[in-house]
Amino acid sequence: MIAYKFLRPDGSSVFASFRWPLPEAEPGDWVEAPVEPCRSGIHACRASHLPHWAGRALYETELGGRIVEDAGKVIAERARLARRVRAWDEQRDAYTRMCADRAHELVRGAPPELAHWDSVVEPSIPEGPALLGFVAARIAEEIEGRADAYHAERARQARWLVERLGLPAM
């Protein structure tokens, strides 16, 4: 199964700080761990969940062995980094800006009591794509008053990423 994983620029994972064997001309070495969601196993995501995990460096990841689907992620017994998605390096700032612009757009159409969200957007840009995607989705949820608006905004963001990064359709 092909999935995706965001890592720090040095190849270490954000939550566990595990340093991955990086791919060069060939995929990196296999890594193994028992599967236990949020505790152990190789955590990755499908393209539809990229906005939830946006980070500095994106890798296409080959999963193997036992694979468990969980909310917003997949957990595998084995994985290796197949390749770095270089298009993310080129599109990360554009994605952040798109999310900021979308947040502004949503606030412009929102009831006056949600106007305070607009002041959050620009100061959040240096924090990067994960925060801006979340802010836009939260504004959508506040406007509609229901969680499916949040998920619809996240799905819109995922479609943008799939298209711009040249990933297989979801």
Roles of regions detected by a PLM:
Residues 1-170:
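Short, glycine-biased loop/turn motifs at secondary-structure junctions and
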